[in-house]
Amino acid sequence: MSQYTDIDRLAVSTIRLLAVDQVSAANSGHPGAPLGLAPAAHVIWKQMRLNPKNPEWINRDRFVLSNGHACALLYSLLHLFGYDMSIEDLKHFRHLGSKTPGHPEFELPGVEVTTGPLGQGISNAVGMAIAQANFAATYNKPDYELSDSYTYVFLGDGCLQEGVSSEASSLAGHLRLKNLIAFYDDNQITIDGNINVSFDEDVSKRYEAYGWEVLHVENGNDDLDAISKALEQAKLSDRPTLIKLTTTIGFGSLNAGSHSVHGAPLKADDVKQLKVKFGFNPEESFVVPQEVYDLYNKSTIEPGIEANKQWDALLDAYVGQFPELGAEVKRRLAGEFPEGWESKLPTYTPEDSAVASRKLSEIVLDNVFDTLPELLGGSADLTPSNLTRSKGAVDFQPPITGLGDYSGRYIRYGVREHGMGAIMNGISAFGANYRPYGGTFLNFVSYASGAVRLSALSGHPVIWVATHDSIGLGEDGPTHQPIETLAHFRAIPNLQVWRPADGNEVTAAYKVALTNKHTPAIIALSRQNLPQLQGSSVEKAVKGGYILQDVDQPDLAIVSTGSEVGIAVEAAKVLAEKNIKARIVSLPDFHSFGQQSKEYQLSVFPDGVPILSVEVLATSGWSKYAHQSFGLDRFGASGKGPAVYEKFEFTPQGIATRAEKTVEFYKGKQVISPLNTAF
Amino acid sequence: MSQYTDIDRLAVSTIRLLAVDQVSAANSGHPGAPLGLAPAAHVIWKQMRLNPKNPEWINRDRFVLSNGHACALLYSLLHLFGYDMSIEDLKHFRHLGSKTPGHPEFELPGVEVTTGPLGQGISNAVGMAIAQANFAATYNKPDYELSDSYTYVFLGDGCLQEGVSSEASSLAGHLRLKNLIAFYDDNQITIDGNINVSFDEDVSKRYEAYGWEVLHVENGNDDLDAISKALEQAKLSDRPTLIKLTTTIGFGSLNAGSHSVHGAPLKADDVKQLKVKFGFNPEESFVVPQEVYDLYNKSTIEPGIEANKQWDALLDAYVGQFPELGAEVKRRLAGEFPEGWESKLPTYTPEDSAVASRKLSEIVLDNVFDTLPELLGGSADLTPSNLTRSKGAVDFQPPITGLGDYSGRYIRYGVREHGMGAIMNGISAFGANYRPYGGTFLNFVSYASGAVRLSALSGHPVIWVATHDSIGLGEDGPTHQPIETLAHFRAIPNLQVWRPADGNEVTAAYKVALTNKHTPAIIALSRQNLPQLQGSSVEKAVKGGYILQDVDQPDLAIVSTGSEVGIAVEAAKVLAEKNIKARIVSLPDFHSFGQQSKEYQLSVFPDGVPILSVEVLATSGWSKYAHQSFGLDRFGASGKGPAVYEKFEFTPQGIATRAEKTVEFYKGKQVISPLNTAF
């Protein structure tokens, strides 16, 4: 006998029609997928552990809509399941300033991650599942199961075609993340028409190859029992599960099964016949029968609120039983670092030896790794180059492999930069103050552009340990030497882009990156050794930019970053011999500097002083802070690092020559600070 | 009985040792993969159709080293097979300015594509296979088989982990590209150690799921016959083939099978024992026994040169038999467009109606598609949005699907932007003047950053039709609205980044992009309608920037792009009412403008005139041409396009206000053109 009755079917129809009404009201949006996916949504959400009054509850189940364009479905669910989402909000679907934007946005209660760019959501979900497994392995104790939640995902063909989902899914299979259950909306339709124009692979077989459990629900349009049965079976698996759900896009619509229902509102007539078909009044919109509210209230909301209460009590008992761990959990849930953690950060003096900044980064990570259990690090298969693995770290691995366990905090991401970026976003979105970091070469952070952008947009404070940050990497040549990379990332809003010049600046970069709760950071680090600079300090560098070395009445300021700062210091000596007085400014992070007071910024770059920037990367973007720029607006070259620097004249003499020309150029001219702008 | 003898084994050892000697001489590089892959390289290259004296021969077989770090192997092969690569060149491996850089570079004879960034090579190879299939289907006639070449690929675990290779491989399976044969170096090692730390999926099963033929050679280290047998079997398949080749990384070395031989030179002792093991003098380096030269000369080089001769004769006969097609082939091989093709390009006057620039792009493509058979277009599943499919185009599809055929010139890429980018590079690298273009939303070109960068670095003139180019796309919201995107791409050397303002500028963008043989282009196009502007013309717009509307003695210049140019024109009217005289400059492409004479550039942006830039994207990079910038240095918002423009004040009044402040700011100040620089 079915566990589902007419009231369940009414609920499914309600979800469907609420979604259709939103799209019609906006005259914009995607009605097709919600119509096909409502039954699965009903089955999943009805049994989910959630508390709409406390959407941040750490032991909630999570639901990720990887096909984010189907957001009218998600908003309908949020309304029906008691979240802060009114019928009025639904009526303002896709309106400017509404709580129902065109794709789900992370800051809305009940929205677990921002989705829309395809392939990201499923990859975020892998990150959430990793975080849950780590949290559980770290804190659960017999009789104190603090964490046992699931992550559910909806994804469509588009998500499956994107490489980022392939990367993340392959890793999820390796990691045997049994807390991850994904529903693949097998509706055979994409924007270009029938999926067979571009995609006839055997998805189930591919996911089996990744090591996933794969199930199939043949009638996703109607068969609630089959969906429920698959869900129960998935929970029994010791692996992540993909449930292939064969559905009809736009189910019930006159154009059901065609791509015309994918991304455009249904015609008025169509909406009417749909309502009649589902037993609703065709003249009414945004209708929720009281029985449906009652159903979900009883099935899900009340039990969820109760479960949250019991969990709170469990946590209190846990704190009593395991005071140290309990305090740590409470601290992490409050989003605070342990008191005095910064004392672990190293500082340097000019007497200390020259060290590659990737190595300096390793020292920071080594020093704080034990103090900050929320650090969950890794590398995209460049561990010995990125130096991202803290001494004594345990790998995050399924215990069965014998290579580590789930309490381990070092992830072997494989050569999967984009997947790593999206997974880090998911780890961060899980909560519990998780701070993911991941290593690769700076040039290959670009492979993950799609995920980096979403970190910034959503405010996930993930950290990229981006080593080999210039032509200084040498022989690997132009395919590996970043040129445009920092210009690209500096143009992304809400993103720190650090390029520290020495030990103190590396410490500053991590200090700011870790302290900030809503801004991701890319830390660009050198392969080659860098001297510890006279004039640098953590206190100054956390400002993002500061006067490293000064002179009375400078003839010019040379502003630089990373490996070129030390060369600029040498250039100042060459200039001094010619009686040209140069102020040296180090500007390790534009974003942090931009947050300082105008007064402070002007003290660094005042009117009257010509400014020359020096950075061995594209000059684009530098005129925000400089009048003249010495950079590399061409691709690099393969050769020994110092030889390549020499070739492009990034030497004390090469800088001094350009500085001289800069001084000459501005002689007798009025020099306005680039910080003084018209509006 | 084996077809291979001692001389073959000597040749394999020679390849191995030449690679090891290169890495040792450079004291930098990757000896491991060449040692494992030399036997397969020997078997493949020995039977390849190639002419080292004419590396551009269109009917050559192609070899792509997707694991580009193994380039010492490729350079050894190029030397042994008679290409312009001397022993002296090998001795300068990884030296600045040498012909043997740290990763293979496209411009070197015999190097088919630039590789190194993992996952790209195999995806490029898919593009080459597409181009070959198209070329053959278009021009082959009974008894005139102009094109029947294969593309061979080496790839490693790293390439297989990258999402871009998943995208391209899935599409290759769908397209049934039987001319593509890939050898997967199953050596179980990556930089992080044993592959099982991150990658235990069943690769063979995955490729079967994609629709590939999958074969396995169990002993890739020694078993030349098994390799050869697999190769022959692959040629019989009607699908692309993946040959899993189990090898030992660093075969023969004391550390064979460990990751220590992956990316660092072998120790001197190790090299010596290796030479002894292979029967070479341990005290000598860069040794090639004459028998090995003789072997390859006889097996491959002489037959290849002869085959090229016969092919030349075949083409001559073809021209006689099929004069029109023959002339077309000759024209394409010469890399020239048909005389007068530009006459098909549309022009507009201000009386023509306002049209979205994506639609204007469609008109251009429609107009030239039949004239230019080298155009091979497509979209990443956004055909109805990108408007990339010319009327009457046939889809490039395996005939068996009934959806098109191989002579079709429209590719359904699926939601695979990165794969599309890499495939386009491969299509271009195939030769025959192929001009691939691909559509997606501008924001999602970023997913393909890794491939875009390689287009620019290698000089593949691919075209991105990048629609929905700003917040003007409206309701889809900030996940789809580009902000940093143009700043990113403008910072890449050798890349045109067009953002045309009207019909004439769209024509200019295509004209320049198509005419240029070594520079890729991104053409950013609006979703919303744009007016045909007074003052625009194709002749002016091809310069990349020009004065659209002028006044006598301007108080300021407003420079803008795309959809904002029309608004700036309206702003000028608002300003005129306040007696502020504004010159309006349209700057559709920084790259083309930068190639004009300094004199011309200064005529647009002279000293003495303050310049305000207006573009509804990140301001970063604009100070190259402007003193003040009005842009959007934050993420966008979901809402109707016009409402979002209003919100951010990109209106005539919003621009006029900032223009007024700009004029005010510079009153009494000396204004130097940003084009006048110190060096």
UniProtKB/Swiss-Prot annotation, chains A, B:
UniProtKB keywords: Calcium, Magnesium, Metal-binding, Thiamine pyrophosphate, Transferase
Known function: Catalyzes the transfer of a two-carbon ketol group from a ketose donor to an aldose acceptor, via a covalent intermediate with the cofactor thiamine pyrophosphate.
SUPFAM superfamilies per UniProt: Thiamin diphosphate-binding fold (THDP-binding) (SSF52518), TK C-terminal domain-like (SSF52922)
Cofactor: Mg(2+); Ca(2+); Mn(2+); Co(2+)
Residues where Mg(2+) binds: 157, 187, 189
GO biological process assignments: pentose-phosphate shunt
EC primary class: transferase
One Pfam family of this chain: Transket_pyr
EC number assigned by the record: 2.2.1.1
Family affiliation: Belongs to the transketolase family.
Cofactor annotation comment: Binds 1 Mg(2+) ion per subunit. Can also utilize other divalent metal cations, such as Ca(2+), Mn(2+) and Co(2+). Binds 1 thiamine pyrophosphate per subunit.
This protein's GO CC annotations: cytosol; nucleus
InterPro entries recorded: THDP-binding (IPR029061), Transketo_C/PFOR_II (IPR009014), Transketolase-like_C_2 (IPR055152), Transketolase-like_Pyr-bd (IPR005475), Transketolase_bac-like (IPR005478), Transketolase_BS (IPR020826), Transketolase_CS (IPR049557), Transketolase_fam (IPR033247)
Quaternary structure and partners: Homodimer.
Catalysed reaction, written as an equation: D-sedoheptulose 7-phosphate + D-glyceraldehyde 3-phosphate = aldehydo-D-ribose 5-phosphate + D-xylulose 5-phosphate
Name the UniProt record assigns to this protein: Transketolase
GO molecular function annotations of the record: metal ion binding; transketolase activity
